[in-house]
């Protein structure tokens, strides 16, 4: 039976997510940006939280853990490399590990760059990728702890997933990401189409996610750093994809 996924807006622009297994009743929260909205969503659905799957240690992704764990006595799954930064963890995971949420299975991908401990969760049976702050729609996370080559390799790992996977990212940044991407690839038809879609979604007060990875591969300039026309557009023709990516990220940082 397919999982039920709910998007839960938290804080200013964070996305919380609940993924529920109807067959067992198990429910996981992907990160815990803020307890109150997640509790309200759980109570609305009549679900009990059994697990919190943490992607990285930043406060806007773990701030609700203590309250949720106290209320639901749920298991906290965290990156192995987070160590003491996520003290409430009951299980620490690394690349290739599989986390079970009732009958659902999430495969762990290590995706460092934004932070060194960052992981993503792939629910293959439900074609769902929870990438938090590694990959955004039409964007990617800032590189705070890792290096640009490290982040590029993480993006390549996610780009290798099938086109029909749906991306669930950590923040609603898509409109600003589109604005930047159009300065690099103004003639990209897929990006132009996504820009119109995003304008309609935000105008109606709807989230811009999920979006398929297939769409992102065509429209997200940060996933296209190895495309010659992208390198040429920023004066980096002939440079390595990692260097092109780094220049794109620097430009976005300063935009």
UniProtKB/Swiss-Prot annotation:
Record's cofactor remark: Binds 2 Zn(2+) ions per subunit.
Keywords from the UniProt entry: Hydrolase, Metal-binding, Zinc
EC number: 3.1.2.6
Catalyses which reaction(s): an S-(2-hydroxyacyl)glutathione + H2O = a 2-hydroxy carboxylate + glutathione + H(+)
Sites where the protein binds Zn(2+) 1: 56, 58, 114, 133
Disulfide bonds listed in the record: none
Signal sequence, start to end: none
Gene Ontology MF term list: hydroxyacylglutathione hydrolase activity; metal ion binding
Subunit (UniProt): Monomer.
NCBIfam families: GSH_gloB
Protein name: Hydroxyacylglutathione hydrolase
């Amino acid at each position: 039976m397919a999982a039920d996924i709910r998007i839960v807006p938290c804080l200013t622009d964070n996305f919380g997510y609940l993924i529920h297994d109807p067959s067992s009743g198990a429910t996981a929260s992907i990160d815990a940006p803020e307890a109150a909205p997640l509790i309200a969503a759980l109570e609305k659905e009549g679900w009990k939280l059994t697990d919190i799957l943490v992607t990285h240690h930043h406060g806007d992704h773990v701030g609700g853990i203590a309250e949720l764990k106290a209320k639901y006595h749920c298991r906290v799954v965290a990156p192995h490399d987070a160590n003491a930064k996520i003290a409430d963890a009951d299980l620490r995971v690394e690349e290739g590990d599989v986390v079970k949420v009732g009958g659902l299975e999430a495969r762990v991908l290590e995706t460092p760059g934004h932070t060194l401990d960052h992981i993503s969760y792939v629910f293959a049976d439900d074609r769902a990728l929870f990438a938090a702050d590694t990959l955004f729609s039409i964007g990617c996370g800032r590189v705070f702890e890792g290096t640009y080559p490290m982040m590029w390799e993480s993006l390549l790992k996610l780009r290798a997933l099938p086109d029909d996977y749906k991306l669930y990212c950590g923040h609603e940044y898509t409109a600003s990401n589109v604005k930047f991407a159009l300065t690099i690839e103004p003639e990209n038809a897929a990006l132009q189409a996504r820009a119109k879609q995003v304008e309609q979604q935000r105008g109606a007060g709807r989230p811009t996610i999920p979006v398929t990875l297939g769409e992102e591969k065509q429209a997200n300039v940060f996933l296209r750093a190895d495309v010659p026309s992208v390198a040429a557009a920023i004066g980096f023709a002939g440079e390595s994809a990692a260097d092109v990516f780094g220049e794109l990220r620097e430009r976005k940082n300063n935009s």
